[in-house]
């Protein structure tokens, strides 16, 4: 097993930088057949976050989410009606969840292990929950997070100093509380819902039931607050003919509405007098104790299970006054009836009895083990193989549960190990990027890579890479387009087509296929000269330059015909022009045809409105073109050549240009909120992709899996086979540090450059000796024989020497450029990348020399000064009449 302390996590990185590190460092170490555990493909998000933003729920298990919402609704009602708990820092209103500023009973110093993580990448309520979980007790965090213990599963009973009521049943409390369309009444606890513009029937019936216990004086105010008159008309209820209220506790048909009055309205409206057997009740507490005991008689034993200290008696004493106003104390004792005293917290116990009643007629929620709350046993975690350990620690927040002073706490697992405490369980929270869990993205990316075919890029069909003109005709047409002045759109189209037809008539030879380097320029020039609006967008996808050209209006045969007819052409004349210019028009209407089924989504993410032939209205022609980036452009040559120490070499990202583009693409995918593994795969540069993909598309051997399968019973004759497997695995799957190769490769270029300049100097000296002898002969002829050698002969000799030095320097430049390219290719090959299809051009040689030139400038200057010295020496000895007629020019 890999030592826990040596595992490197990525907790402090976020968004595109984090995802880039995962793809570039973790993904290459996974086999293509690596299977991501299904439990890790989803994560935990606090229900409050999801209720405010439904899209956040896409990364959670729906059954777990529904269970958490139900449980959280119960816990919220318990917390908000209790005088002791006060653990929630929010208040739920119609359509919104508001943060409250009043103190809550949560401590940031309870956990002995200090938390230093912020979790800014999490939604606000999930982040708040996680901070509570890592600073307070695990029990309180589970209460706030809506935890439900799975039945018959491997889970942990957390320890806590004090525990709260644990009710578990299916409900819609949170949805009811957050229902947006409610009457804006003074009493916020009772939410009267509006359905189709009118008070809901259920709430109307309950309010009518409560209304009978409100005094005559307060009823108008009550009716106005809840629009009772409008609702009564809607439901056909005559408020004036309602039966008189039954206000005697002995004959009252139901205590429901009287309890509701005590629960919600007692402090806002005055209540009518309540009687017991004709005697007027004197105390509100006795009324609520009697009614609550009678209504929820069967639930009192269940209440006592949760609150053993609550007073429960077999009788109740009611203080009343008879009709003559004499005090009468009535002791009520009924067979098999208990009376509970809830006066210490009426609101809480009325609410709790309602919860117990709902539980009695509902089904309990069944859930499976949660990786976020229950996790796995620590021993199970330690027994995981290298790949699983690396994958989990890089894609998930990893927590541990431990006990301290008979209380269970949760902290970052590495912090627990550092504090030298013993974890009991390990909990995982898969991270989310761009609306998907990173674990799921990695799974999709591996699947996309495994199912890929040989790489293809959008390549133009060769049959439409010409306009039917020979090379001479094409060049004439190309130059003619450059001369086209700004003219009206219709006129420009007609003139270009007629010019083409004129050139076509006298043109001979096979069609000239447009070269890829001039294709985009020709497209732009052709359509712009015709008056089309042409715009170009360029970017990088993977290791390819992407060009997207949009042409407005859309180019079709019908549009061309209609445009020609607008320029005084008859339909017949327009058809003749089109027939004569068939190859040109076929090229024009076919430019948007490209093939690459793997890149459709890739381009859609670049320009969403350009997918499938342009905008929804079909007003544009879209041309997509992709060309591989040259080798030197993929490499950070400036960073390489500016590094002078080993540390600087190691800090250099060799493939910085394409990696930077990859990060930008990841950032855009994340912002879209619709990132997929296919997106990552399409945007992945070769330097990463080639470290994952092996020849023939087969997966390499997983060292971890292979070592797991080796047992003491393995045949000793398998030693050589196992050794070969290990060597092959190390060769194909172990990531090599590219930067360690740079110093060795590039220093060799400088050394070879010095060696080659010495060789060049020797050869130049030998050749210069011939010119020196020639100059000596001319000097002898003029000095001894007094014969005059013309300046043209002398100048010709000096020009030949200049040509010799130019050729020598050109050969030297080509040699150094090749040496530099060889060093670059050496770096790429040793980095595990494939360069079999690389094609080196003259431009690459020029660029290669320009990159290495600053490092060898002193040697070049030395050679130039040496050559200049020879030139000036010969020129002086030749004694030319016009000495300024020829001079030595260097670079």
From Swiss-Prot:
Pfam families: Pox_P4A. The precursor is cleaved by OPG083 to give rise to the 62 kDa mature protein during virion maturation. Proteolytic cleavage of major core proteins OPG136, OPG129, and OPG098, which occurs at a late stage of core formation, is required for production of infectious mature virions (MV). Keywords: Virion. The keyword Isomerase does not apply. InterPro entries: Poxvirus_P4A. It comes from the Viruses. Residues 615-697 form a propeptide. This is Major core protein OPG136 precursor. It comes from Vaccinia virus (strain Western Reserve).
């Amino acid at each position: 097993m890999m030592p826990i302390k040596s595992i490197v996590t990525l907790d402090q990185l976020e968004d595109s930088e984090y995802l880039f590190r995962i793809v570039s460092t973790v993904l290459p170490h996974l086999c293509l057949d690596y299977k991501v555990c299904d439990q890790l493909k989803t994560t935990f998000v606090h229900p409050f976050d999801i209720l405010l933003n439904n899209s956040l729920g896409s990364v959670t298990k729906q059954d777990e989410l529904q269970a958490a919402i139900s449980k959280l609704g119960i816990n919220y009602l318990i917390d908000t009606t209790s005088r002791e708990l006060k653990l929630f820092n929010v208040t739920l209103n119609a359509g919104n969840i508001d943060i409250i500023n009043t103190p809550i009973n949560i401590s940031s110093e309870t956990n002995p292990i200090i938390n230093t993580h912020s979790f800014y990448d999490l939604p606000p309520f999930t982040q708040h929950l996680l901070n509570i979980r890592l600073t307070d007790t695990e029990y309180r965090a589970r209460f706030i997070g809506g935890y439900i213990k799975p039945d018959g599963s491997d889970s942990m009973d957390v320890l806590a100093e004090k525990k709260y009521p644990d009710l578990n049943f299916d409900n819609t409390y949170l949805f009811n509380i957050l229902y947006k369309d409610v009457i804006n009444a003074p009493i916020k606890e009772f939410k009267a819902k509006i359905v189709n513009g009118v008070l809901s029937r259920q709430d109307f019936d309950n309010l009518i039931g409560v209304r009978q216990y409100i005094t005559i004086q307060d009823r108008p105010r009550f009716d106005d607050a809840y629009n009772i008159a409008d609702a009564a008309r809607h439901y056909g209820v005559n408020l004036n003919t309602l039966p008189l209220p039954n206000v005697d506790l002995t004959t009252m048909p139901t205590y429901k509405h009287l309890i509701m009055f005590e629960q919600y309205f007692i402090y806002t409206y005055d209540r009518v007098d309540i009687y017991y057997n004709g005697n007027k009740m004197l105390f509100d507490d006795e009324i609520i104790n009697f009614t609550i005991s009678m209504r929820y008689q069967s639930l009192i034993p269940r209440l006592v299970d949760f609150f053993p200290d609550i007073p429960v008696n077999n009788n109740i004493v009611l203080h009343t006054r008879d009709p003559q106003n004499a005090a009468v104390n009535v002791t009520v004792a009924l067979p098999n009836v208990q009376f509970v005293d809830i006066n210490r917290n009426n609101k809480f116990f009325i609410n709790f009895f309602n919860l117990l009643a709902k539980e009695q007629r509902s089904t309990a929620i069944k859930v499976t083990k949660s990786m976020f709350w229950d996790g796995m046993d620590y021993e199970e975690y330690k027994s995981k193989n290298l790949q699983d350990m690396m994958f989990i620690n890089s894609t998930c927040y990893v927590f541990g549960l431990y006990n301290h002073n008979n209380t269970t706490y949760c902290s970052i697992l590495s912090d627990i190990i550092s504090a030298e405490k013993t974890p009991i369980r390990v909990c995982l929270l898969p991270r989310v990027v761009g609306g998907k869990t990173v674990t799921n993205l990695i799974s999709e990316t591996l699947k996309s890579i495994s199912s890929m075919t040989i790489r293809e890029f959008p390549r133009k069909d060769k049959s439409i890479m010409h306009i039917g003109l020979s090379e001479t005709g094409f060049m004439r047409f190309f130059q003619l387009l450059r001369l086209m002045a700004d003219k009206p759109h219709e006129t420009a189209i007609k003139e270009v087509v007629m010019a083409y037809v004129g050139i076509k008539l006298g043109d001979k030879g096979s069609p000239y296929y447009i070269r890829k380097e001039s294709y985009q320029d020709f497209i732009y020039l052709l359509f712009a000269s015709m008056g089309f609006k042409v715009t170009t967008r360029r970017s990088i996808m993977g290791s390819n330059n992407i060009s997207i050209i949009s042409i407005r209006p859309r180019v079709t045969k019908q549009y061309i015909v209609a445009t020609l007819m607008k320029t005084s052409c008859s339909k017949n004349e327009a058809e003749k022009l089109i027939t004569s210019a068939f190859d040109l028009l076929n090229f024009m209407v076919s430019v948007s045809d490209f093939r690459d089924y793997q890149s459709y989504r890739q381009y859609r993410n670049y320009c969403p409105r350009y997918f499938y032939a342009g905008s929804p209205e079909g007003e544009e022609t879209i041309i997509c073109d992709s060309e591989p980036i040259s080798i030197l452009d993929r490499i950070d040559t400036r960073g390489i050549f500016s590094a002078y120490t080993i540390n600087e070499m190691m800090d250099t990202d060799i493939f910085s240009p394409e990696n930077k583009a990859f990060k930008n693409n990841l950032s855009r995918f994340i912002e879209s909120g619709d990132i997929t593994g296919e997106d990552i795969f399409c945007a992945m540069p070769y330097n990463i992709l080639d470290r994952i993909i092996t020849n023939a598309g087969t997966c390499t051997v997983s060292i971890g899996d292979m070592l797991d399968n080796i047992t003491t019973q393995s045949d000793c004759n398998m030693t050589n086979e196992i050794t070969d497997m290990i060597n092959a695995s190390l060769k194909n799957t172990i990531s090599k540090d590219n930067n360690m190769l740079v110093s060795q490769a590039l220093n060799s270029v400088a050394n070879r450059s010095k060696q080659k300049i010495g060789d060049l100097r020797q050869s130049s000296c030998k050749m210069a000796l011939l010119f020196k002898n020639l100059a000596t002969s001319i000097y002898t002829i003029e000095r001894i024989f007094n014969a005059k050698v013309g300046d043209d002969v002398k100048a010709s000799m000096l020009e030949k020497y200049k040509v010799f030095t130019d050729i020598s320097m050109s050969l030297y430049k080509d040699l150094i450029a090749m040496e530099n390219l060889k060093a670059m290719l050496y770096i790429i090959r040793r980095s595990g990348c494939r360069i079999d299809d690389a094609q080196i051009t003259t431009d690459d040689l020029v660029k290669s020399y320009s990159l290495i030139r600053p490092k060898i400038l002193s040697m070049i200057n030395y050679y130039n000064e040496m050559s200049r010295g020879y030139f000036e020496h010969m020129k002086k000895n030749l004694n030319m009449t016009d000495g300024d007629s020829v001079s030595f020019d260097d670079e």
